[in-house]
């Protein structure tokens, strides 16, 4: 059975989110309807609602084109899809988590409607055939000018932004480099440096936007250098909101951040969530402002 669900009929959503649960007869499903808010479109009570997956139990589903408003994909959303061959990733997708294909048959084909909108595809890069297909001679996984994985590079790792347009989430998770330097102006993402083993991260003069949770969680990180002399936007999320600098570091770990710009973006700096374990080295001109809006130790460059 091949089912195509239109976006709407007479301005209303066509189906509720439980419509395909345990429908083993479906082989192909193309969903155009928009119903991202699970409870908003469910016709069942909260107790009866199966919140894990819209297609859970579709054991014969081979082709699945997801609804355009789907923003993330995890193992629960494909649970039990044991015949899956092709999955179409919609334009609105932001994150495909590491465990995405752990509870279903691993697809043989992944189609991206707009790859440039994605920020994390850890689940896809764990597919052996996909990783092999896009691994370069230097061991890096690169697709459509986006750096997906740096491989197990050691020493000093330099990423040149003239060739790389975006650095995805968890791109350095397998890297053994102690120093990471990013030049040019590639776009960074949430979790770009998460789980890296670096002691020092250096961001080049053309990088002015530090996405929300860009540095993620790191047990070894000692220094961050922001070389830009322009206004730095801290913690910009995918919805355009300012979340400030949010670092996950062990309680015993101290971190030094060197900011070379004497320009100050108040709206994003006042959202910083770092404490006195973080020492910020800034130009004298903006020391007072950093002391006013953050809980960090502030010293002059």
Regions found by a protein language model. Name each.
Residues 1-14, 23-49, 57-72, 81-95, ...:
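Structural signature of tandem-repeat unit edges
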Residues 289-293:
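Terminal, low-complexity interaction segments
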Residues 121-125, 191-193, 213-215, 236-237:
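Short secondary-structure transition/capping segments
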Residues 55-56, 78-79, 101, 215-216, ...:
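A structural signal for leucine-rich repeat
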């Amino acid at each position: 059975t091949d089912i195509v669900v239109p976006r709407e009929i007479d301005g209303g959503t066509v189906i509720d989110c439980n419509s395909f649960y345990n429908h083993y007869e479906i082989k192909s499903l193309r969903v155009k309807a928009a119903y991202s808010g699970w409870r908003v479109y469910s016709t069942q009570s909260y107790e009866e609602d199966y919140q894990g997956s819209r297609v859970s139990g579709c054991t014969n589903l081979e082709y699945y084109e997801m609804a355009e408003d789907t923003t993330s994909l995890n193992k629960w959303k494909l649970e039990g899809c044991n015949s899956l061959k092709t999955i179409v990733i919609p334009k609105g997708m932001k994150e495909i988590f590491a465990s995405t294909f752990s509870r279903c048959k691993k697809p043989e084909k992944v189609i991206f409607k707009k790859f440039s909108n994605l920020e994390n595809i850890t689940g896809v890069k764990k597919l052996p055939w996909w990783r092999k297909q896009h691994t370069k001679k230097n061991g890096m996984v690169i697709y459509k000018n986006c750096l997906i994985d740096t491989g197990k590079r050691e020493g000093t790792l330099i990423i040149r932004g003239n060739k790389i347009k975006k650095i995805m989430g968890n791109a350095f998770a397998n890297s053994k480099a102690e120093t990471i330097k990013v030049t040019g102006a590639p776009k960074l993402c949430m979790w770009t440096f998460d789980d890296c083993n670096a002691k020092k991260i250096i961001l080049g003069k053309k990088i002015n936007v530090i996405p929300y949770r860009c540095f993620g969680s790191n047990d070894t990180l000692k220094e961050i250098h922001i070389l830009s002399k322009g206004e730095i936007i801290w913690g910009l999320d995918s919805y355009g909101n300012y979340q400030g600098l949010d670092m996950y570091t062990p309680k015993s770990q101290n971190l030094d951040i060197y900011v070379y710009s004497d320009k100050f973006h108040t709206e994003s700096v006042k959202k910083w969530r770092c404490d006195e374990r973080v020492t910020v080295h800034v130009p004298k001109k903006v020391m007072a402002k950093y002391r006013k809006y953050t809980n960090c130790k502030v010293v002059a460059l």
